[in-house]
Amino acid sequence: WPVRSAAPSSSAFISANHFSSDDDSSSPRSISPSLASVFLHHTRGFSSNSVSPAHDMGLVPDLPPTVAAIKNPTSKIVYDEHNHERYPPGDPSKRAFAYFVLTGGRFVYASLMRLLILKFVLSMSASKDVLALASLEVDLSSIEPGTTVTVKWRGKPVFIRRRTEDDISLANSVDLGSLRDPQQDAERVKNPEWLVVIGVCTHLGCIPLPNAGDFGGWFCPCHGSHYDISGRIRKGPAPYNLEVPTYSFLEENKLLIG
């Protein structure tokens, strides 16, 4: 068998009609049909794989929606749910309306907050009627010694008694050990001449009668409690002495209660 060369020259694979050897340029070489078909197959495959569409050729590749939105951005569209229309951002008709609504809402909100704050502050300050009831000025110049006057303060009666020297001596001579609610007379008065007490019985809230009872002070007709000239309980069911309110002397003959 004749021996065939394992690797033919590259010039033989191209074509016998285009290339020839240096020794014999006039006689073309023949090529095997099987080798020519293999060479053409690989050449066509290489050419078809190497040629691909490029972006600069005007072809748009198929991209995912998110990538396409990033590479091809467009203006955002705002959907109007009320009119079922689409308006681009910053539409003049919608911008003016939104500005009016926001400004009006802020004004109304500020007005409501102002009213609430004023109402809260005014509610904390006392009215004139309350201030008038909180304190009471009493002129003492018309009260005679040994007499009692009754004034109204915070809806309660207040007894003001101008005591005589005998009244003062009698109040100081009482044995504290015999008292149900022991209290010295000096602890209950700021000026020995004047006794100021709230005219409400400490038993059940009745109003005692002045210049009555067994001890020359007050007597409660409801349940028979007796108070002395210093307003201390001496007899009866009342557990405590008559209450002494807060008071002060503005002048010699002017008293401020409260």
UniProtKB/Swiss-Prot annotation:
Its EC number is 7.1.1.8. One of its GO terms (cellular component) is mitochondrion. It holds the Pfam family Rieske. CDD domains: Rieske_cytochrome_bc1 (cd03470). It is found in: Mitochondrion inner membrane. GO terms for biological process: aerobic respiration; mitochondrial electron transport, ubiquinol to cytochrome c; response to heat. Keywords: 2Fe-2S, Disulfide bond, Electron transport, Iron, Iron-sulfur, Membrane, Metal-binding, Mitochondrion, Mitochondrion inner membrane, Respiratory chain, Transit peptide, Translocase, Transmembrane, Transmembrane helix, Transport. Residues 161-256 form the Rieske domain. Residues 47-95 are mitochondrial matrix. The keyword Cytoplasm does not apply. PANTHER family: CYTOCHROME B-C1 COMPLEX SUBUNIT RIESKE, MITOCHONDRIAL (PTHR10134). The Rieske protein is a high potential 2Fe-2S protein. NCBIfam families: Rieske_proteo. This is Cytochrome b-c1 complex subunit Rieske-1, mitochondrial. It comes from Nicotiana tabacum.
